[in-house]
A protein has these predicted regions:
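Recognition helix of helix-turn-helix/homeodomain-like DNA-binding domains
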Residues: 27-41
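Alpha-helical structural elements of signaling/regulatory helical domains
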Residues: 16, 41-42
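A short, Lys/Arg-rich alpha-helix, primarily the initiator
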Residues: 1-13, 51-52
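DNA major-groove recognition helix of helix-turn-helix/homeodomain DNA-binding modules
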Residues: 44-63
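Short acidic DE-rich linear segments
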Residues: 62-70
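Short alpha-helical "recognition helix" segments of helix-turn-helix
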Residues: 20-22
Length: 70
């Protein structure tokens, strides 16, 4: 998969728009647009960190829901 395809999957799973995705990570919207369009590539470590943050956020939300139920 290309970086832009991986980003699209991550964005879709997060339920965010491109603009929300950019704001969430504190990245200029135009840069994010270029990443999604494949006009610009980011360093691989940035992509890994973004995915890691999304995964951890999802886990934290899951734990919060569990705690609320108890």
């Amino acid at each position: 998969m290309t970086q832009s395809e991986i980003l699209e999957v991550a964005k879709s799973q997060s339920g965010m728009t491109q603009k929300e995705f950019a704001e969430y990570f504190g990245i200029p919207y135009r840069t994010v647009q270029d990443w999604f369009a494949g006009r610009r590539n980011m360093p691989d470590y940035v992509l890994r960190l973004m995915i890691y943050k999304l995964e951890m956020e999802k886990k934290v939300q899951g734990l919060s829901k569990e705690l609320e139920q108890n």
